[in-house]
Protein backbone atom coordinates (compact mmCIF):
# COMPACT_ATOMS: atom_id res chain seq x y z
CA UNK A 1 0.00 0.00 0.00
CA UNK A 2 2.86 2.38 0.84
CA UNK A 3 4.61 1.55 -2.44
CA UNK A 4 1.45 2.27 -4.43
CA UNK A 5 0.99 5.56 -2.59
CA UNK A 6 4.57 6.64 -3.34
CA UNK A 7 4.17 5.62 -6.98
CA UNK A 8 0.88 7.46 -7.34
CA UNK A 9 2.42 10.64 -5.92
CA UNK A 10 5.38 10.32 -8.28
CA UNK A 11 3.19 9.92 -11.36
CA UNK A 12 1.21 13.04 -10.44
CA UNK A 13 4.40 15.14 -10.54
CA UNK A 14 5.29 14.04 -14.07
CA UNK A 15 4.03 14.75 -17.56
CA UNK A 16 2.74 11.77 -19.52
CA UNK A 17 5.71 11.78 -21.91
CA UNK A 18 8.11 11.41 -18.97
CA UNK A 19 6.83 7.91 -18.17
CA UNK A 20 7.75 4.72 -20.05
CA UNK A 21 7.37 0.96 -19.70
CA UNK A 22 9.16 -2.08 -21.08
CA UNK A 23 8.00 -5.67 -20.62
CA UNK A 24 10.10 -8.84 -20.60
CA UNK A 25 10.17 -12.27 -22.17
CA UNK A 26 7.94 -14.00 -19.59
CA UNK A 27 5.32 -11.33 -18.88
CA UNK A 28 1.81 -12.78 -18.88
CA UNK A 29 -0.72 -11.24 -21.23
CA UNK A 30 -3.16 -10.37 -18.44
CA UNK A 31 -0.55 -8.15 -16.78
CA UNK A 32 0.35 -6.54 -20.11
CA UNK A 33 -3.30 -5.88 -20.91
CA UNK A 34 -3.93 -4.28 -17.51
CA UNK A 35 -0.78 -2.17 -17.85
CA UNK A 36 -1.81 -1.03 -21.32
CA UNK A 37 -5.25 0.01 -20.06
CA UNK A 38 -3.61 2.05 -17.29
CA UNK A 39 -1.06 3.74 -19.54
CA UNK A 40 -3.63 4.55 -22.20
CA UNK A 41 -5.97 6.01 -19.59
CA UNK A 42 -3.14 8.21 -18.30
CA UNK A 43 -2.25 9.21 -21.88
CA UNK A 44 1.17 7.53 -21.65
CA UNK A 45 2.34 6.17 -25.00
CA UNK A 46 5.93 5.05 -24.37
CA UNK A 47 5.59 1.29 -23.86
CA UNK A 48 6.97 -1.72 -25.70
CA UNK A 49 7.07 -5.50 -25.33
CA UNK A 50 10.13 -5.73 -27.61
CA UNK A 51 12.67 -5.28 -24.81
CA UNK A 52 15.43 -6.74 -27.05
CA UNK A 53 15.02 -3.89 -29.58
CA UNK A 54 13.44 -6.15 -32.19
CA UNK A 55 12.31 -4.29 -35.31
CA UNK A 56 9.46 -6.68 -36.11
CA UNK A 57 6.61 -4.76 -37.84
CA UNK A 58 3.45 -4.26 -35.82
CA UNK A 59 0.75 -3.61 -38.43
CA UNK A 60 0.13 -7.14 -39.72
CA UNK A 61 -0.39 -10.05 -37.33
CA UNK A 62 1.09 -12.48 -39.84
CA UNK A 63 4.38 -10.57 -39.60
CA UNK A 64 5.07 -11.85 -36.07
CA UNK A 65 3.45 -15.29 -36.13
CA UNK A 66 4.94 -18.71 -36.85
CA UNK A 67 2.22 -18.98 -39.47
CA UNK A 68 2.71 -22.58 -40.61
CA UNK A 69 2.49 -23.72 -36.95
CA UNK A 70 4.82 -26.23 -35.33
CA UNK A 71 2.70 -29.08 -36.67
CA UNK A 72 3.05 -27.60 -40.15
CA UNK A 73 6.73 -28.52 -40.14
CA UNK A 74 5.61 -32.14 -40.47
CA UNK A 75 4.24 -31.29 -43.94
CA UNK A 76 7.11 -29.09 -45.13
CA UNK A 77 9.10 -30.23 -48.16
CA UNK A 78 11.36 -27.17 -48.62
CA UNK A 79 12.78 -25.06 -45.78
CA UNK A 80 14.87 -21.89 -45.72
CA UNK A 81 16.17 -20.83 -42.29
CA UNK A 82 17.35 -17.23 -41.94
CA UNK A 83 19.02 -15.54 -38.99
CA UNK A 84 18.28 -17.84 -36.08
CA UNK A 85 19.62 -20.80 -34.10
CA UNK A 86 16.81 -23.33 -33.67
CA UNK A 87 19.10 -25.73 -31.81
CA UNK A 88 19.69 -23.32 -28.91
CA UNK A 89 16.78 -20.91 -29.18
CA UNK A 90 13.81 -23.23 -29.75
CA UNK A 91 14.72 -26.91 -29.20
CA UNK A 92 11.14 -28.09 -29.77
CA UNK A 93 11.03 -26.63 -33.28
CA UNK A 94 14.58 -27.81 -33.89
CA UNK A 95 13.58 -31.38 -33.01
CA UNK A 96 10.57 -31.15 -35.32
CA UNK A 97 12.76 -29.98 -38.21
CA UNK A 98 15.22 -32.81 -37.58
CA UNK A 99 12.42 -35.39 -37.45
CA UNK A 100 11.03 -34.17 -40.77
CA UNK A 101 14.52 -34.09 -42.32
CA UNK A 102 15.22 -37.66 -41.17
CA UNK A 103 12.06 -38.77 -42.97
CA UNK A 104 13.76 -37.86 -46.24
CA UNK A 105 11.01 -35.48 -47.34
CA UNK A 106 12.62 -32.15 -46.39
CA UNK A 107 15.30 -30.18 -48.24
CA UNK A 108 16.95 -27.39 -46.25
CA UNK A 109 18.88 -24.23 -47.04
CA UNK A 110 20.31 -21.84 -44.45
CA UNK A 111 21.51 -18.24 -44.26
CA UNK A 112 23.10 -16.62 -41.20
CA UNK A 113 22.71 -19.68 -38.97
CA UNK A 114 25.24 -21.81 -37.03
CA UNK A 115 26.86 -24.69 -38.90
CA UNK A 116 26.29 -27.28 -36.16
CA UNK A 117 22.55 -27.85 -36.49
CA UNK A 118 21.51 -31.54 -36.31
CA UNK A 119 20.36 -31.74 -39.92
CA UNK A 120 22.07 -31.21 -43.23
CA UNK A 121 21.43 -28.60 -45.87
CA UNK A 122 23.11 -26.03 -48.05
CA UNK A 123 24.66 -23.10 -46.15
CA UNK A 124 24.73 -19.76 -47.93
CA UNK A 125 27.08 -18.10 -45.45
CA UNK A 126 26.51 -15.25 -43.01
CA UNK A 127 25.94 -12.26 -45.27
CA UNK A 128 22.33 -11.17 -44.82
CA UNK A 129 22.63 -8.77 -47.76
CA UNK A 130 22.25 -11.83 -50.02
CA UNK A 131 18.48 -11.58 -49.63
CA UNK A 132 18.46 -8.45 -51.79
CA UNK A 133 20.59 -9.91 -54.58
CA UNK A 134 19.00 -11.22 -57.78
CA UNK A 135 21.35 -14.20 -58.03
CA UNK A 136 20.18 -15.40 -54.61
CA UNK A 137 16.54 -14.94 -55.60
CA UNK A 138 17.16 -16.99 -58.73
CA UNK A 139 18.74 -19.72 -56.60
CA UNK A 140 15.76 -19.75 -54.26
CA UNK A 141 13.27 -19.80 -57.13
CA UNK A 142 14.93 -22.95 -58.38
CA UNK A 143 14.96 -24.43 -54.87
CA UNK A 144 11.31 -23.68 -54.11
CA UNK A 145 9.96 -24.60 -57.54
CA UNK A 146 7.20 -27.21 -57.31
CA UNK A 147 7.29 -27.13 -53.48
CA UNK A 148 3.94 -28.10 -51.99
CA UNK A 149 4.45 -26.82 -48.45
CA UNK A 150 7.48 -24.49 -48.41
CA UNK A 151 8.56 -22.71 -45.23
CA UNK A 152 10.82 -19.73 -44.58
CA UNK A 153 11.83 -19.26 -40.94
CA UNK A 154 13.06 -15.77 -40.05
CA UNK A 155 14.63 -15.30 -36.62
CA UNK A 156 13.92 -12.35 -34.35
CA UNK A 157 17.63 -12.28 -33.51
CA UNK A 158 18.70 -10.92 -36.87
CA UNK A 159 16.20 -8.06 -37.01
CA UNK A 160 17.38 -6.31 -33.84
CA UNK A 161 19.66 -4.01 -35.82
CA UNK A 162 18.74 -0.70 -37.45
CA UNK A 163 18.24 -2.69 -40.66
CA UNK A 164 15.74 -4.99 -38.97
CA UNK A 165 12.59 -3.65 -40.63
CA UNK A 166 14.25 -3.77 -44.04
CA UNK A 167 15.41 -7.35 -43.49
CA UNK A 168 11.92 -8.41 -42.41
CA UNK A 169 10.39 -6.64 -45.42
CA UNK A 170 12.82 -8.26 -47.85
CA UNK A 171 12.25 -11.75 -46.46
CA UNK A 172 8.49 -11.22 -46.58
CA UNK A 173 8.88 -10.14 -50.21
CA UNK A 174 10.80 -13.36 -50.92
CA UNK A 175 8.05 -15.39 -49.26
CA UNK A 176 5.43 -13.87 -51.54
CA UNK A 177 7.62 -14.03 -54.64
CA UNK A 178 8.50 -17.68 -54.06
CA UNK A 179 4.89 -18.73 -53.43
CA UNK A 180 5.65 -19.54 -49.81
CA UNK A 181 2.55 -17.51 -48.97
CA UNK A 182 -0.60 -18.67 -50.77
CA UNK A 183 -4.32 -18.64 -50.13
CA UNK A 184 -4.19 -22.20 -48.84
CA UNK A 185 -0.80 -22.05 -47.10
CA UNK A 186 1.29 -19.50 -45.23
CA UNK A 187 4.84 -20.73 -44.81
CA UNK A 188 6.27 -17.43 -43.56
CA UNK A 189 7.31 -18.21 -40.00
CA UNK A 190 8.68 -15.54 -37.68
CA UNK A 191 10.63 -17.14 -34.85
CA UNK A 192 10.82 -15.44 -31.46
CA UNK A 193 12.37 -16.94 -28.34
CA UNK A 194 10.14 -14.99 -25.96
CA UNK A 195 7.03 -16.59 -24.49
CA UNK A 196 5.24 -13.26 -24.12
CA UNK A 197 6.09 -11.67 -27.48
CA UNK A 198 3.11 -12.83 -29.56
CA UNK A 199 0.63 -12.04 -26.79
CA UNK A 200 2.16 -8.62 -26.23
CA UNK A 201 1.97 -7.73 -29.90
CA UNK A 202 -1.54 -9.19 -30.19
CA UNK A 203 -2.91 -6.83 -27.52
CA UNK A 204 -0.97 -3.86 -28.88
CA UNK A 205 1.70 -3.41 -26.21
CA UNK A 206 3.92 -1.43 -28.53
CA UNK A 207 4.26 2.32 -29.25
CA UNK A 208 1.69 4.14 -31.34
CA UNK A 209 1.08 7.82 -32.01
CA UNK A 210 4.18 9.58 -30.65
CA UNK A 211 5.24 6.67 -28.45
CA UNK A 212 8.82 5.43 -28.08
CA UNK A 213 10.02 1.92 -28.83
CA UNK A 214 12.31 0.17 -26.33
CA UNK A 215 15.43 1.44 -28.07
CA UNK A 216 14.27 5.06 -27.92
CA UNK A 217 13.19 4.62 -24.31
CA UNK A 218 16.70 3.43 -23.49
CA UNK A 219 18.32 6.42 -25.20
CA UNK A 220 16.10 8.92 -23.36
CA UNK A 221 16.38 7.58 -19.80
CA UNK A 222 17.09 10.34 -17.24
CA UNK A 223 16.94 12.95 -20.03
CA UNK A 224 13.28 12.90 -20.94
CA UNK A 225 12.08 9.69 -19.28
CA UNK A 226 11.88 10.18 -15.50
CA UNK A 227 9.83 7.13 -14.53
CA UNK A 228 10.44 3.67 -15.98
CA UNK A 229 8.25 0.62 -15.42
CA UNK A 230 10.09 -2.68 -15.87
CA UNK A 231 7.35 -5.28 -16.21
CA UNK A 232 9.38 -8.44 -15.64
CA UNK A 233 11.90 -6.91 -18.04
CA UNK A 234 15.01 -8.41 -16.47
CA UNK A 235 16.69 -8.64 -19.87
CA UNK A 236 16.25 -4.97 -20.76
CA UNK A 237 19.83 -3.71 -20.73
CA UNK A 238 20.47 -0.04 -20.03
CA UNK A 239 23.08 2.18 -18.40
CA UNK A 240 22.33 2.92 -14.74
CA UNK A 241 25.41 5.06 -14.08
CA UNK A 242 23.58 8.28 -14.94
CA UNK A 243 20.15 7.43 -13.60
CA UNK A 244 19.99 9.74 -10.57
CA UNK A 245 16.96 11.51 -12.06
CA UNK A 246 15.25 8.25 -12.98
CA UNK A 247 12.76 6.36 -10.82
CA UNK A 248 12.53 2.66 -11.67
CA UNK A 249 9.49 0.55 -10.84
CA UNK A 250 9.83 -3.24 -11.05
CA UNK A 251 6.70 -5.33 -11.49
CA UNK A 252 7.36 -9.06 -11.46
CA UNK A 253 7.91 -12.30 -9.62
CA UNK A 254 11.42 -13.49 -10.51
CA UNK A 255 13.24 -10.62 -8.80
CA UNK A 256 16.08 -11.08 -11.22
CA UNK A 257 18.47 -8.41 -12.55
CA UNK A 258 15.98 -5.54 -12.66
CA UNK A 259 14.63 -5.80 -9.11
CA UNK A 260 17.83 -4.66 -7.30
CA UNK A 261 18.03 -1.67 -9.65
CA UNK A 262 14.54 -0.51 -8.77
CA UNK A 263 13.30 2.18 -6.41
CA UNK A 264 9.84 0.66 -6.11
CA UNK A 265 8.98 -3.05 -6.35
CA UNK A 266 5.44 -4.29 -6.97
CA UNK A 267 5.38 -8.12 -6.65
CA UNK A 268 3.16 -10.03 -9.04
CA UNK A 269 1.91 -13.60 -9.29
CA UNK A 270 4.24 -16.27 -10.65
CA UNK A 271 1.57 -17.68 -12.97
Predicted region positions:
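Catalytic alpha/large subunits of respiratory electron-transfer oxidoreductases
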Residues: 1-271
Amino acid sequence: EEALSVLSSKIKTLKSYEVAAVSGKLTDVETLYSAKLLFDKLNMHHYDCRYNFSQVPTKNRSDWLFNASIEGIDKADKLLIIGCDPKREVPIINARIRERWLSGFLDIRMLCVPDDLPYEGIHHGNDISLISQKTFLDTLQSFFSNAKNPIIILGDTIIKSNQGKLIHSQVKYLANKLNVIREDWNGFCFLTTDASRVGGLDIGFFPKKDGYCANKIKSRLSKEIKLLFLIEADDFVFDTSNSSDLTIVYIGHHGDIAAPLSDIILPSSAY
